[in-house]
């Protein structure tokens, strides 16, 4: 596994400054982000690897077959990327309603727990998901539409408690954590909410991107 993922190349390849997909023959933004941008509030997505071949198989084994021994490995890979950008305050993308009850665990929360307890990152668990729809079953257009109101800030005492270590204020620089970036609509929705709440810069890190 250590030799399969070459973390030395993280952030070194030419990528789209918006969605993070690798660029081959252009600079700055990919064609999709130039012609039909989704990521407006998001200050760039950094996916570590492409969601292809064995990467797809590993994700299936981790998420669907619950092989949780991959969690510390994936957390280490995220750490390798995050330490190069200097992002220190992480916001996990929340699961759909009922997922934890059905599966018994949340993969993104587990990643963030490793990043918090093993590598010293601060984790702000302040986003909630309002729907139980599975995004993977939707088309691109449906995904973009469904995420507009799918997320929100946690409210009341939960938010107050989460922000207490930060003197009650939302940090200006935040980094979203998710497993796969497909259309970018989920990350964009979450980033927009965080900026409305006062964040100045919201980057996103994902394990994989669908390209």
Q: Which residues make up each language-model segment?
A:
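Glycine-rich phosphate/pyrophosphate-handling loop used in enzymes and phosphotransfer proteins
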Residues: 1-211
């Amino acid at each position: 596994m250590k030799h399969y993922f070459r973390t030395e190349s993280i952030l070194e390849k030419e990528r789209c400054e918006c969605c993070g997909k690798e660029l081959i023959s252009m600079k700055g933004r990919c064609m999709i982000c130039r012609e039909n941008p989704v990521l407006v509030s998001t200050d760039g997505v950094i996916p570590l690897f492409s969601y292809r071949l064995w990467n797809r198989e590993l994700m299936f084994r981790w998420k669907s077959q619950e092989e949780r021994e991959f969690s510390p490995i994936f957390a280490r890979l995220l750490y390798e990327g995050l330490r190069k950008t200097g992002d220190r305050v992480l916001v996990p993308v929340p699961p759909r309603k009922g997922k934890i009850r059905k599966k018994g665990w949340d993969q993104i929360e587990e990643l963030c727990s490793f990043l918090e307890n093993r590598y010293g990152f601060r984790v702000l668990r302040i986003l909630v998901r309002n729907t139980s729809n599975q995004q993977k079953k939707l088309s691109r257009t449906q995904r973009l539409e469904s995420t507009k109101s799918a997320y929100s800030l946690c409210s009341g005492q939960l938010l107050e408690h989460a922000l207490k270590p930060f003197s009650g204020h939302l940090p200006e620089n935040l980094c979203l954590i998710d497993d796969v970036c497909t259309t970018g609509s989920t990350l964009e929705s979450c980033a927009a909410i965080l900026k409305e709440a006062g964040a100045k810069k919201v980057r996103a890190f994902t394990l994989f991107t669908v390209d």
